[in-house]
């Protein structure tokens, strides 16, 4: 899979741009605040219909404009697929092969991306919410079923929390309706929990292999899924977990009404990364945390290939300068000759020459993208 063409209209600082890319390595060079990261972000948004930098679509639309449009041509082994995403105050409209999609869940997965950014260390060092978001976004690209289930779960969770607030304030008193919401939440919560566990078990295998290569077998990386469901019971079927969630909601009903919020479910779960059986977030060195984050991110590439049959596109947003030679080498080994890559940099000096041996180079200046001619 690769992106052969990208068109932007009224996207951030881009008035109008049409860029044709190499199926191999594409390097975007420019000073800060010229639009390099915006271009990478546009590819990410085209893939996932949301930004990794903001939750507000208005920020993606050029100042004084009513909409932004991103159009791309995806080349797969099965053929070409035109994609289009329009962002406006009315919401998002997504097209595949010029046909508007009724749901974004039908659109996501047409273009798969893996993004490396300076904030990736937050996967290890950040809050549980950061790790849940990471799982949901990455797994959502590979499984439309998971994307649907997590979307339904979040929607029902919002309704249930609102109703718990009403019960807390005595603006409502119908516990039968609360039971209906609890039943629905338990059903989707069980689906999400089982899928997350399976996804993380698969990712762990890839990440372990990469981590051992980087550390030359000195360290072993393992994942531990943390839930209110006891660990020994997490390997149950969806039906068994559904029944367990139902029981927990019944037991916690008085406490949840008192607090006005849902206390049980995968929206409170976490994943713990262990290096040699020690929590790397709490006890790992900066180097161990970086290696863990890199191993987890690199594992996405092979996992997506295994799940979808196609390699994803790799987006490297100003991260190579932060990696030492060893980590750059392992990054290079992972994507060389098999993954279309986009990388941003202010200078080529900090980038290993092997990575940019035959790139297509673009200069980005104030929202204008110019391809440099090969010598």
Curated annotation (Swiss-Prot):
Residues annotated to bind ATP: 30-37
HAMAP family: RecF
UniProtKB keywords: ATP-binding, Cytoplasm, DNA damage, DNA repair, DNA replication, DNA-binding, Nucleotide-binding, SOS response
Record's protein name: DNA replication and repair protein RecF
Any Gene Ontology biological process: DNA synthesis involved in DNA repair
Family: Belongs to the RecF family.
Stated role: The RecF protein is involved in DNA metabolism; it is required for DNA replication and normal SOS inducibility. RecF binds preferentially to single-stranded, linear DNA. It also seems to bind ATP.
Species name: Latilactobacillus sakei subsp. sakei (strain 23K)
Higher taxonomy: Bacteria, Bacillati, Bacillota, Bacilli, Lactobacillales
CDD domains given in the database record: ABC_RecF (cd03242)
GO cellular component: cytoplasm
An example molecular function term from Gene Ontology annotations: ATP binding
UniProt keyword annotation of Nucleotide-binding present: yes
Localization in the cell: Cytoplasm
Pfam families: SMC_N
């Amino acid at each position: 899979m690769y992106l052969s063409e990208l068109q932007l209209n009224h996207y951030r600082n881009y008035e109008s741009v049409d860029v044709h890319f190499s199926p191999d390595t594409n390097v975007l060079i420019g000073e800060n605040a010229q639009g390099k990261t915006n271009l990478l972000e546009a590819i990410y948004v085209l893939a996932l219909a949301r930004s990794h930098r903001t939750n507000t679509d208005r920020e993606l639309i050029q100042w004084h404009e009513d909409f932004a449009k991103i159009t791309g041509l995806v080349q797969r082994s099965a053929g070409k697929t035109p994609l289009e995403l329009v962002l406006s105050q009315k919401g998002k409209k997504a097209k595949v092969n010029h046909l508007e999609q009724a749901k974004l869940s039908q659109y996501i997965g047409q273009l798969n991306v893996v993004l490396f950014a300076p904030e990736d260390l937050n996967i290890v060092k950040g809050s549980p919410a950061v790790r849940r978001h990471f799982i949901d976004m990455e797994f959502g690209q590979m499984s439309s079923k998971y994307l649907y289930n997590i979307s339904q779960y979040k929607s029902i969770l919002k309704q249930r929390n609102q109703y718990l607030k009403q019960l807390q304030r005595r603006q409502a008193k119908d516990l039968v309706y609360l039971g209906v919401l609890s039943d629905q939440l338990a059903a989707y919560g069980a689906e999400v929990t089982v899928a997350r566990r399976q996804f993380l078990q698969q990712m762990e295998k890839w990440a372990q292999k990469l981590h051992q290569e980087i550390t030359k077998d000195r360290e072993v990386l393992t994942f531990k899924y943390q839930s209110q469901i006891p660990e020994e019971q997490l390997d149950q079927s969806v039906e068994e977990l559904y029944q367990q969630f139902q029981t927990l909601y019944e037991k916690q009903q008085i406490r949840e009404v008192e607090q006005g919020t849902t206390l049980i479910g995968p929206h409170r779960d976490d994943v713990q990364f262990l290096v040699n059986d020690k929590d790397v977030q709490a006890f790992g060195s900066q180097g161990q945390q970086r290696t863990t984050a890199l191993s987890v991110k690199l594992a996405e590439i092979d996992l997506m290939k295994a799940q979808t049959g196609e390699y994803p596109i790799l987006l490297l947003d100003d991260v190579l300068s932060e990696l030492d030679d060893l980590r750059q080498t392992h990054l290079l080994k992972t994507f060389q000759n098999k993954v279309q890559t986009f990388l941003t940099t202010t200078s080529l000096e900090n980038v290993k020459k092997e990575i940019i041996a035959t790139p297509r180079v673009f200069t980005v200046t104030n929202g204008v993208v110019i391809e440099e001619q090969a010598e």
